[in-house]
Amino acid sequence: MQISISLQGQSKIIYQIFRSYYENAVLDLPQDIELREFAYQPFNSDTYVRHLTFSSVDELRSFILSNVPLHLYFSAARYQIPSAKEMEQKGWLGSDLLFDLDADDICEINVRRFCSGMEILSETCDGEVREISEITVDCINRVFENALVLKDILIQDFGLKPRIFFSGNRGFHIRVDCYNEWANLDSEDRREIAEYIMSPSPPYESNSESGPGWLGRFARGINGVKIDEQVTVDPKRLVRIPGSLNGKAGLKVIEIVNDKFEYDEYLSPFEGIVAFQSNLSGKFNVLGHEIQLRRGEITKLSAKTGVYLALKGYGVIKAHVR
């Protein structure tokens, strides 16, 4: 049984840590904020609240501080009436182009199983089974390398201006802000783009690594990029707001500039230290460094690491000091 990402039964301390962050958070919002649908997932809930609208950044911030989000989104689409409950009533005005790359699709994830806090290699367990998926620096770097290839495709083959964002967990989003004919692409048009990226078919072979488009990429050993096709195909998809927190890991959704990215605890914006009580025993790879935990033992950790561990189901935070 995989650990739920819900915070039901989790300490309220994380809620307060998130709220403190949002008091001064800088959110990267579109200029046409009034045309976007907003959505969020509250703490202690597995469902989303959708069809929200805001006319200004200040109005959104006030809402966030009263309704602290575990996850926060806006729509890739623009609407005449974004608050309408039914999609056909919203009045679609076009959408940005989205791509999603996730570690699950690109790396072999190391899934470790625990029974009553101790790691097990067999299927036998008389107690609760917990599964922990460890993400390594090498894995995230591989996903990022794929994101850079996709960025190059969008620039060189389509003449677009893509932006890469770290998802705040274990992947990357690429967004192209569209305000022209690209915004009006329907699902089938977007599917063709996704297929061009995932399963390219050059008209002939070439040994020239500097050749145009997929001819050169094939010569360099690049045979396609694995993306979540459904994200690209759906013009009414929700996308994480840059500057918000990903409630699966407590890391910040950030734009990648200068094509440089490092996967470490500094992706977390939290300050101070926490008293963390582990539910598991063992050595773990956490945000690029190894950590030793013992079940039931309270350990002093940085808030950056402690919040990540708590959200991933390793244990609970007992206290936080800024």
From Swiss-Prot:
Its EC number is 2.7.7.-. It is an enzyme of class 2 (transferase). GO terms for cellular component: DNA-directed RNA polymerase complex; primosome complex. Catalytic subunit of DNA primase, an RNA polymerase that catalyzes the synthesis of short RNA molecules used as primers for DNA polymerase during DNA replication. The small subunit contains the primase catalytic core and has DNA synthesis activity on its own. Binding to the large subunit stabilizes and modulates the activity, increasing the rate of DNA synthesis while decreasing the length of the DNA fragments, and conferring RNA synthesis capability. The DNA polymerase activity may enable DNA primase to also catalyze primer extension after primer synthesis. May also play a role in DNA repair. This is DNA primase small subunit PriS. One of its GO terms (molecular function) is metal ion binding. Pfam families: PriS_C (PF20873). Belongs to the eukaryotic-type primase small subunit family. It comes from Sulfolobus acidocaldarius (strain ATCC 33909 / DSM 639 / JCM 8929 / NBRC 15157 / NCIMB 11770). CDD domains: AE_Prim_S. It comes from the Archaea. Heterodimer of a small subunit (PriS) and a large subunit (PriL). Keywords: DNA replication, DNA-directed RNA polymerase, Magnesium, Manganese, Metal-binding, Nucleotidyltransferase, Primosome, Transcription, Transferase.
